[in-house]
Structures are given as C-alpha cells and as structure tokens.
Amino acid sequence: MSQYRTFTAQDAVEYARTFGGIDDPSTLVEAQEVGDGNLNLVFKIFDTTGVSRIVVKQALPYVRCVGESWPLTLDRARLEAQTLVAHYQHCPQHTVKIHHFDPELAVMVMEDLSDHNIWRGELIKGAWYPQAARQLGEYLAQTLFHTSDFYLHPHDKKAQVATFINPEMCEITEDLFFNDPYQIHERNSYPAEIEGDVAALRSDAQLKLAVAALKHRFFSHAEALLHGDIHSGSIFVADGRLKAIDAEFGYFGPIGFDVGTAIGNLLLNFCGLPGHLGIRDAAAAREQRLTDIQELWNTFAERFQVLATEKTRDAALRAPGYASEFLKKVWADAIGFCGTELIRRSVGLSHVADIDTIQDAEMRHECLRHAITLGKALIVIADRIESVEALIARVRQYS
C-alpha cells in the first residue's frame, strides 16, 4: 500500500514511467508543473524529444491558494477519477482519458491534451470554435442521461449515489455559490468601487429566497452524476474537438447545475468581452456567445430527448411527454444556477480571467456590475424564462 507524499517533478516522471502506458517508458525524462488551480499539483511529462506525452495529477490535502489552514479530503481524487471514468464510458469523445489512479497517493495519470487549448483563454481572445458548444451539449446529454433514473436500474442508481457522496467538495460549492456572496464574509473578494452593488445582494430578500430554493435543490436532487464544475477553464478545445477535465466536484445532483454552470461561464465571457476587444470585435464575439448558448442548450435538450425515447428503462418515465416536462424543470434550474455562477464569480473567492484580466479598472468594474445585474435577474425570474430564445432576449435587455 502506498503512503501519501507530495510529488516532486522526479516523482511524477517515475510514476508516469510505471503507469503511463508508454511503449518505451525510458523515453520519459522530464516533468514540468503546469497546474494553475487551487487544489492540485499537475505535471506534464516530456520525452527525450521534448514532446509532452502524459499528465500526472495529484490532489493536495489543502486549498493551495489559502494554505494548510483550509484542509481538504484526499478522497476527492478518487471521486474525480471515478467521475471521469464514468463520463468517459458514456462520452469518450469529449472526456479526458484516465490511464491509472492510486487512491492512497491521490494521484492519477491521464492523457495529454497539449494539442488542445483551454477554452476560457480562447474565448477571451475572441477565438470561436463553432462546434464547441454543440460538443459540450452532447457531453452533458450523454453523461447526465446515462447516470440518471431514466437509464440506470434503481438499485444501481442508489449504489452509485452512495459511491459518489462528496460532502467536503459539495460544502465548498454550497458556500461559494449560495452563502458567501449574500453575506459579509472574509472569502469574498471584489473592488471597493462595487460595494454598493454587493451590499444590494445582501439586502435583497426576494433574491435570497430564490437562492435558498436553488441551494435546497443542490442539497436534495440526486438526478445524475454531475461534473460539478463544468466551466470554460475545465474544458479543452481544438479544431473540431472538445474534452472535459477536472471533475473533483463530481457528485449526484440536479442536472440543471451542470447545464447552468456551463451557460453561466459563456455569459461571464459575454460580460467581459468589451474589456478585451475593440467595439466591433467585442460585439461580434458577443453574438457568438449567444449562438453558443443557444446551440449548447438545443443540442443538450434534443439529444437528451432522443436518448430518453430510445433508452429509458423505467415504465413510468417512458410515459409520452414526460421527458419533455422534465427538461422544462431542468431548464428553469439551469437559469437559476447560471445566475448564481455569474454572481459568485464576480464577488466571491474564485473569479474568472474573462473579467479579472481586464486592464482598464473602470471597464472591469462595469463588467462586474453587468454580471451581477444579469445574475440577479436570472435567479429571480428563472421560472419566467421559458426558452433559450427568451434567455437571449433577457441578456440583450440587460446589456
């Protein structure tokens, strides 16, 4: 049995030689730490020709950006590996491949995606991958349908829910999405110039009631095995290709949470684009984001509907029209969760480069206000936004 230790670069090389599945392991000679996240060490392993061949990822026992004063369970590495393995089973074309996992060392070996780019960085530059939103919709439909009650036998579903209980990581989500932004808290981070906007969140009783309902759904609706953190920084893209990574927040929760988080990150980019591009380029890129949102939802809903028609095993859930009614509830959830993503990324602990890297301070503050205003509106009126076209109309209204 392995005993946990924090990997050095040389440890990562030796581990990749043993478990990387490379025909000639001796060609692996160097590791470079590339992780910019808060929770893990990530090493790219290079061969003698300087080509990156494999990735080694190890969970740390604390939140990196805070330090050892915020400890974290190492079991999240098991949950991430098992979530990605399950998602790969149902959607291999859009899920990173896990070659090996060691629960004692909290380390996994996975495919290298050096020929891809992180989607967030591409979106900030104004680069458009026309197929990416449809591919993300396909990933969400395949992974969420095949881990839901529509497809799984009830006994299997209940056993999987137990396997994927992830209380410590869920608590982080519960705090950062549903608690911190609506109270004075030391984890919150925002410029003093928007204090009035943030104070308005804390005093908005209608908003806080709607957020409470969303948190309750996050607590209690074990609908499918979520990725749990499906933002544009956890997605790699290349021409015609897309892969999801980083699933340590995976657990059985409301389907609308994954869908809403994905849409929310596209809207965060929408809000930040005027701070990165000229007027015409920003306007064009914003239209691309709205197209992305429409294609993401339409692909997800259409594919989920087809899968439900063809593969639903439960007799009651096969009732004509039920899948459509279920998707209406998923949509309403998604709009609300989307709003919480917009707000928590603007005023909470974890921000996004789409807005934080805007050089002009006044423009950055304006983009933050835009995200907060849009997020508030979506949370409060989620049940009145009945279609993706209505969502896009609302986004235009608040822009």
UniProtKB/Swiss-Prot annotation:
Its EC number is 2.7.1.100. Pathway: Amino-acid biosynthesis; L-methionine biosynthesis via salvage pathway; S-methyl-5-thio-alpha-D-ribose 1-phosphate from S-methyl-5'-thioadenosine (hydrolase route): step 2/2. Keywords: Amino-acid biosynthesis, ATP-binding, Kinase, Methionine biosynthesis, Nucleotide-binding, Transferase. GO terms for molecular function: ATP binding; S-methyl-5-thioribose kinase activity. InterPro entries: Aminoglycoside_PTrfase, Kinase-like_dom_sf, Methylthioribose_kinase. Substrate binds at D229, R344. Transmembrane segments: none annotated. The keyword Transferase applies. One of its GO terms (biological process) is L-methionine salvage from methylthioadenosine. Coiled coil: none annotated. It catalyses: 5-(methylsulfanyl)-D-ribose + ATP = 5-(methylsulfanyl)-alpha-D-ribose 1-phosphate + ADP + H(+). ATP binds at N40, K57, E111, D112, L113, D246, A247, E248. The keyword Nucleotide-binding applies. It holds the Pfam family APH. Belongs to the methylthioribose kinase family. HAMAP family: Salvage_MtnK. Homodimer. Catalyzes the phosphorylation of methylthioribose into methylthioribose-1-phosphate. This is Methylthioribose kinase. The lineage of its organism: Bacteria, Pseudomonadati, Pseudomonadota, Gammaproteobacteria, Enterobacterales.
